[in-house]
């Protein structure tokens, strides 16, 4: 995932998980000062949990649940990259490797203090895909994918004699 140089690093505590790639949290500014902010995970997108498409909703709710599970371990690190088009802080979230619950892939971004990127974990586990802020991918359910594959098989196969 391509990243801009980090602006700032903060410790955060969870207030609420909105979906698989957005949270509300308290950001510790130091000197006993905390501010509540909405954080949009930089460089990834997850499927929507509030949609009429039932298949997409299932994937969206799974991403939201995994995001919550990773963050409930306690304090996490936020590396901020400024604000996005909707005024949310764009950031990468880092947690303790213990929060992940399984062996961590080598392609997961790690901070200098050994924390691991939730953004990368969500991609590696199939809960998210890389996203550069442009046009979003349209969700295609597994059923639609299977139907399309079967249709291609019928078209590609020569007629039997």
Sequence positions of predicted segments:
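Small beta-barrel nucleic-acid-binding modules, primarily SNase/OB-fold domains
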Residues: 1-161
